[in-house]
Amino acid sequence: MPKNQICQRVEALRQFMDKHGLDAFVFPSSDPHNGEYVPSHWKTREWISGFNGSAGTAVVTRGRAALWTDSRYFLAAEEQLQETPFALMRERIPGTPSVAEWLSEEIGTGGRVGVDGWVFSIAEEHALREELAFHGLDLVLAEDPAETLWEERPAIPQAPVCLHPIAYAGKSAADKIKDLRERLQARHVEATLVCKLDEVAWLANIRGTDVHCCPLVVAYMWVTQQKAVLYVDDAKLDDTVRKALLEQGIECRPYGSLVQDLPVCGVQSVLLDVNSTNSRLGELLPEACKIVSGGSLIAPEKAVKNETEINGFRNAMYRDGIAMVKFLHWLLPAVKTGDQTELSVSRKLEEFRAMQPLYKGLSFDTIAGYAAHGAIVHYEADEKSDCELLPKGLLLLDSGAQYQDGTTDITRTIALGTLTEQERIDYTLVLRGHIRLAMVRFPAGSTGTQLDVCARYAMWQQGVNYL
């Protein structure tokens, strides 16, 4: 992306801020459904900053701009933010201020900080509002500046909705909704709004391609004791899918109708998952409706897999293993022959996977990092960075696939030929860390941070570490 475009967008945003009486604007990495993976339409943080990592927060004031991200993306962010107005803020590194701390220094007491409430969950908005207030700053739910400033903004995805057969789901949508209603009744709540796309897909037994590398549909679901409504754009439904959903007790209404329906929902109480329901939707419920804040009612049920799902996972792993072994058999001779690059081997691995039954696509963009590129967390080769593979050194390969009966993710570090002594040492130290971590016994309640010591111990003994 041309760096001058970022500068122009930041200046246009500052004019927007002047017009709306804002001293700063905050762009998170989320969408109205607060999922981990975001359709292009809502990638406003990437649009304003040029940084395309999956995690990060961009903040623009009238005079400065900064981007916060974690250690996975330090190297990528350093490169992508060069020659832009954005300074890199390294999260969880001593001395790095929080967004609120930085803003308190930049705009001072009484400053107005704008956010788009459609992409902040109720919990996130509440937490940021409190932290800003502690520093004497006000949080303002503003319009989405990208709505007017983002030229050629991608549309909200319109891919067709597909049914997920019970042969792979193991349980009908009608039965899942029945169980959800029982849980609502046990909580003495009349209704719930399901916002997370993976939870909507699981509950309604539907799949789609609205999110890159994820079989998801952009939709909401409203469930009461009397009805279940799937809010999804009409263009995505054919008659067969609509009829099948109706047979499961699911009515379909246009995606945008939720905004009109919530204020007249006619229930006295609703349970909202404050971590996935966006702030704007929470505001739309009528004042007489009691909002019961809580966690998701779907996630615990979705996490307990039935026998059909478990068998599906096993079968998917088996087929994916076949594809991986075929690829590994092909790889070394191909590298010795020459003309193989990070991108070419990624494509070849995808070819082997596509030969397997029930293959639907990649589960994420393949990470093929050769030599120094293997040290860049979440590295993604492109035409500019792509490099030739030689019959020496290490290739990091992190890849996976979506099958109709399961999802896979496998990482391997492959020696393409002769290794240097240091490469052997580093590989062995990492392997020892894996073994130590796999063998450790730990008490319930232990944290990942505590167990991380086991993974790093062998390296620390040799005076090396990783971020």
Q: How does the language model describe each region?
A:
Residues 1-467:
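Active-site neighborhoods and metal-handling regions in enzymes and metal-associated proteins
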